[in-house]
Amino acid sequence: MTKHKQILIGLLVIITIIFVGIGIYSQNLPKKLYPGEVLEYEGQDLSLINDFRENSIKGPQQIKESTYSLTITGLVNQTIEFSYDEIINEFQKYQKVTTLHCVEGWSVTILWEGFLLEEILEKAEISSDSEVVIFYAYDGYSTSLPLDYIRNQEIILAYKMNELILPPERGFPFQLVAESKYGYKWIKWITEIELSNDLSYKGYWETRGFSNDASIK
């Protein structure tokens, strides 16, 4: 081996050690707490908002409150559109501590605050033929859940987490809290909700082999 090659190999080893060290150091840094974020609720410890990992299909979406609208379509007696303020001011608010489990193996327990999804959907007068609720997001993501599940589990559409308005990276203006389902059902940046009877509908990850049921076993 020539002296030149030995020097190159030595430099590569040093660079590798430096990058590994940086990675270990960054993993051990304390995670930033959002100003005003609560870490405990009624005796239960909560995860940090920054404990979430970024795994959206196109990165965090920036949606303006002033131009946002949520449309309810499909098997309803009337298509209806809500502004952000209309949802915030018209519907009863609920809180619940729920854990999101990701298929990647991590989980977070958060205090969510929002609105019963069923109450929002009923404003459009749900047709008796409706069986499935399909959700569409600003970034092109979609997923679906049975209407009975949404009713029976009292699923909420969250606008706050740990007492703070959802930050853009966590789904502002609204994130679905699909408790007992894996994280890919917890759709963020929702812009349209469609009532359907298409039991075979599959969303973004479901068409790529993920379970359409997504129940945590």
Predicted features along the sequence, with ranges:
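Helix N-cap and loop-to-helix transition residues
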Residues: 2, 81-83, 116, 146
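Short, flexible micro-motifs
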Residues: 77, 108, 117, 174, ...
